[in-house]
């Protein structure tokens, strides 16, 4: 018989840097999960993606065991890395902060494809371009 799920926890944690301090500790402590066990496993799984923020979905079962699924980094994080900026524009309509080439947008869209509900890479590119626009990043051919 399948184990009964008692809680789902969604977090965004820097790759390879999970530790029991907030936000990880309190979120998992409430669910009764072995926090150090999660941190070690998460850090081992994401050590190759250092510098990126990784969304993770943790499923906690009745016997306090857990499984987790790591997702692809948010489009905004990938765009900031591609553009070489620390943050997006405070006024995206007025102030543009960077430019990104369309082939870089395609690369980001292909990376994000498993987590997006897009039928094609072109549709995923449009989603990424929308994120870029809202951050004040200009897309050029």
UniProtKB/Swiss-Prot annotation:
GO biological process: translation
Modifications made to the protein after synthesis: One or more lysine residues are methylated.
Gene3D superfamilies membership: Ribosomal protein L11, C-terminal domain, Ribosomal protein L11/L12, N-terminal domain
GO CC list: cytosolic large ribosomal subunit
InterPro entries linked to this entry: Ribosomal_uL11, Ribosomal_uL11_bac-typ, Ribosomal_uL11_C, Ribosomal_uL11_C_sf, Ribosomal_uL11_CS, Ribosomal_uL11_N, Ribosomal_uL11_N_sf
Domain of life, per lineage: Bacteria
Keywords: Methylation, Ribonucleoprotein, Ribosomal protein, RNA-binding, rRNA-binding
GO MF term list: large ribosomal subunit rRNA binding; structural constituent of ribosome
CDD domains documented for this protein: Ribosomal_L11
Function: Forms part of the ribosomal stalk which helps the ribosome interact with GTP-bound translation factors.
Family of this protein: Belongs to the universal ribosomal protein uL11 family.
Subunit organization: Part of the ribosomal stalk of the 50S ribosomal subunit. Interacts with L10 and the large rRNA to form the base of the stalk. L10 forms an elongated spine to which L12 dimers bind in a sequential fashion forming a multimeric L10(L12)X complex.
Name recorded for this polypeptide: Large ribosomal subunit protein uL11
Organism of origin: Shouchella clausii (strain KSM-K16) (Alkalihalobacillus clausii)
Native organism taxonomy: Bacteria, Bacillati, Bacillota, Bacilli, Bacillales
């Amino acid at each position: 018989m399948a184990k009964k799920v008692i809680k789902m926890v969604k977090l965004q944690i820097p790759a390879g840097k999970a530790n029991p301090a907030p936000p990880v500790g309190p979120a998992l402590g409430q669910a009764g999960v072995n926090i150090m066990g999660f941190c070690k496993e998460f850090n081992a799984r994401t050590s190759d993606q250092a510098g990126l923020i990784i969304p993770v979905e943790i499923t906690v079962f009745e016997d306090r065991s857990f499984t987790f699924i790591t997702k692809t980094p948010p489009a905004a994080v990938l765009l900031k890395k591609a553009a070489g900026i620390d943050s997006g524009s405070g006024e995206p309509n007025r102030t543009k902060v960077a430019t990104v080439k369309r082939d870089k947008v395609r690369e980001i869209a292909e990376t994000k494809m498993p987590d997006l509900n897009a039928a094609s890479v072109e549709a995923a590119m449009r989603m990424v371009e929308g994120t870029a626009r809202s951050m004040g990043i200009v897309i050029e051919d």
